[in-house]
């Protein structure tokens, strides 16, 4: 499986401002490249804290082009993703360490292997993604 990390930081090496704001620390060209990266992967993976703080859509949007949308994946050990989240619809997979409960129209699966902190272990996450037909994931 191909795993790609996309990361943006400010000049001082931070990923958010002192007040916790993290939206738009990059410019338009970098955001477009981020959407190209999204379109080039089978899945986009975020943690539940990103969902709670940013409520992202996690879609690939390229001007003038229609693209197949990647599977949206949320690592959510305690199943805190709100049913009202923008990504709590179809084409979303939530991987959790607790008994699965409905979250909007998203698929929710328990990942059996957990790390010492009670979170899904990365090898188990990759195995679950592979089982979902994912060959490449953008983090």
Regions found by a protein language model. Give the residues of each.
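Active-site ligand-binding patch in enzyme domains
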Residues: 2-11, 15-136
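Gly/Thr-rich phosphate-binding loop signature of adenosyl cofactor/nucleotide-binding cores
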Residues: 139
């Amino acid at each position: 499986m191909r795993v790609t990390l996309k990361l943006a930081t400010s000049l001082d090496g931070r990923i958010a401002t002192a007040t916790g704001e993290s939206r738009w620390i990059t410019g338009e060209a970098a955001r477009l490249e981020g959407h190209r990266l999204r379109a080039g992967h089978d899945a986009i993976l975020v943690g539940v804290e990103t969902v709670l703080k940013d409520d992202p859509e996690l879609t690939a949007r390229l001007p003038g082009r229609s693209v197949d949308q990647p599977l949206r994946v949320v690592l959510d050990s305690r199943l805190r993703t709100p049913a009202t989240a923008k990504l709590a619809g179809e084409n979303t997979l939530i991987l959790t360490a607790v008994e699965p409960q409905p979250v909007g129209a998203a698929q929710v699966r328990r990942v059996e292997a957990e790390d010492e902190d009670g979170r899904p272990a990365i090898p188990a996450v990759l195995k679950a993604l592979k089982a979902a037909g994912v060959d490449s994931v953008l983090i």
